[in-house]
Amino acid sequence: MDKSCAEHGSFSTLIWADSAENYLRWLEYGGMDVNRLPQDEEEADKATGWKSFACEACQLPASSALMTTNRCNMNCPVCFTRDKNEPLHEPSLEECEALMRRYKELAGDDALIEFCGGEPAVRKDICDLTNAARTIGFDYIQLNTNGIELAKNKDLARTLRFCGLTTVYLGFDGMSDKPYYAKYGKPMLNIKKKAVENCANAGLAVVLVCCVIPGENDGELGQIIEYAKQNMPTVKGVYLQPISYFGIYPHDKIRRITIPDVIRRLDEQCIDISAQDFGPGAYDHAQCSFNACYMLGKDGRLKALTRFSKREREENAVHRLRKNMRATWMPSQNKMLTVGGMAFQDNSNIDLMRVQRCSIQIIQRDGRLIPLCSKYLSSCDGHKIFDGIG
């Protein structure tokens, strides 16, 4: 991607490590008309004429995150949500209930809810908050967590499940301690494994979420898939996020890895996985996500249920996507595994055409829905468009 700014000059950023032909085919298979892509600055201005990072011009989200607290039980050298200069903010249970009701009004009765932070599990009333979400009518409730509280307190997992929690979206960055030192600054693998064990005993579904950092853990993706296989049906998915540079990160170690890179690593490291199993999402922008789905066979091998093929945009695609998330990421005994991921944007590669089709949004304190990449976008000096965690 080439960008030009009157104030900061011109620069280029790698957004797709593959041929131009394959890039355009990926966009086309994601439901985009590549013949209508902007060809010059004037056309680009028309395509993004709304010029807003906020929600008003965006499509409905597949899921939205309620930022429950900016407290955390870690002090990580890499974190895209945290602002060390921000004062303590933890909305009350009543405030959270009001925001969830407002979100349901905006997004529809089949909306999905996520609890984020900070670390949401440090809230003393996290179980009450979960029960409140269920009472409001959410049947898919997801906890985005580092797993520390779940690992040290097996009763917490059981109580959360009893209160209505369905899915644990667990940071899980590798099968050695090397990537945990890079991201968390300390060894964490045993804590992650204990969290998975306690979730399994509680009947919770788990999605392993890996921030893919070149040179740190991109050689361990196959091992993560194997661990997921061994822990089915508790583990329902492996979600890979190529590192983006916003929030807190080491400014002297910026290394890009793109969706094609991640898919190639999976193809090379996993005997059961082929690059041809993956395709783009048809609801969000094709450049944002990739996914495949597998069933565990009697022989212990993963069998692909998906293939790279053209996907047409549907008028009610958001509802189909929500239905699919329920079918694949909620507790069940079926041995199905999704493998996919999302490439978040930062100040070097932010694209308003992608923002406009954001499928994961943040519930703002005032009730608005903000695209995730807009919410956490920060300049090189740390300045953000939107202050605060929520």
Where are these regions (language model features)?
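Short loop/turn segments at strand-loop or loop-helix junctions that form parts
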Residues: 68, 81, 170-175, 241-243, ...
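Radical SAM/AdoMet-radical enzyme domain recognition
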Residues: 97-114, 123-242
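Radical SAM enzyme core and accessory elements
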Residues: 1-46, 291-390
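Conserved aromatic-histidine-acidic binding/catalytic patches
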Residues: 64, 88, 118, 184, ...
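Radical SAM enzyme [4Fe-4S]-AdoMet core and its adjacent flexible, acidic
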Residues: 189, 201-336
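A short catalytic or substrate-binding loop motif that flags glycine-/basic-rich loops and adjacent residues
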Residues: 58, 285-287, 353-354
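Conserved alpha-helical substructure of the radical SAM core
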Residues: 7-12, 16-18, 22, 28-145, ...
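A short acidic, helix-capping loop that chelates divalent metal ions and anchors anionic groups
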Residues: 87, 176-182, 247-250
